[in-house]
Amino acid sequence: IVVSNGDFWKDYPRDIDVSRRPGKLGGMLLLAKIYALLPRMRGYDIVQFINPLFFELKAKRLYRIFKNLKRHNQKTVLGGYGMDAYWAYVCSKDMPLRYSDFNIGKELRQNEEAIAERKDWIGTDKGRLNLLMADQCDGIVTGLYEYWRCYEPFFPEKTTFIPFPIVIGKEPDIPQETPEKLNLFIGISKNRSAYKGTDIMLRAAEKVKKDFPDKLNLKVVTGLPFDEYVRTMMGSDAIMDQLYSYTPSMNPLEAMNHGVICIGGGEPESYEI
């Protein structure tokens, strides 16, 4: 079963919804709901945590829930799929990647989002929860090369890279003739465009559109749920993804599954792993 909040506005499908309402009352209601669900979350062979903050609760609340789930199930697996303490710390201190959300070369990025995430994860309650879970979980699964690079040095025996899965449908019908206009699609994450580098890619696309208005159709969307994002993307020739990524993530993988070209991360390391 999938117990999730749908990753907020992305609204991914799930079996049990644990979205949080706003405010302290929302936190109390969510905590009560989770404690009511805990007896149903026993006896499983594997429990996988998508992130150290696996519910929308403060880290100090999640310690006890993690211990309960670990005690009453066989194996636990921590997912390295995005923002967490290892990603923030390693990319800010050791800097094994040529570029990331936190560094360009050996220089720390000082944009607002990077500063906020470092402050949020390094030496904090949620950071300590991440360290505990990484140490006590039976395995760690990472979905991108970048995240594997941050966990593997600390846990070489139990860190495994498993690429993101995509459900393959029928082969897309791709026209052979060159279109008169290129249909270019770019999705902007709310409040994270500078952090992910999509602001730079958008400016580049807008300049091409300005210089060659008869050669390019540019569609820009913001904050769409995943299913709507995929529907809106259909019919595009190419999508522009994150600038600071070594590896295609879920959106470009889904795009390529439908025959849409991805302009984004594709560094040699992501293929060599």
Language model features: what each stretch is:
Residues 87-88, 118-159, 203:
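A short, active-site helix/loop in glycosyltransferases that binds the activated sugar's phosphate group
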Residues 160-196, 202:
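Conserved donor-binding/catalytic core segment of Leloir-type glycosyltransferases
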Residues 230, 252-257, 271-272:
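Short alpha-helical segment that forms part of, or immediately flanks, the ligand-binding pocket
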Residues 244:
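Aromatic "clamp/platform" in nucleotide-sugar-dependent glycosyltransferases that forms part
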Residues 261-265:
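Short hydrophobic beta-strand element within catalytic cores of glycosyltransferases
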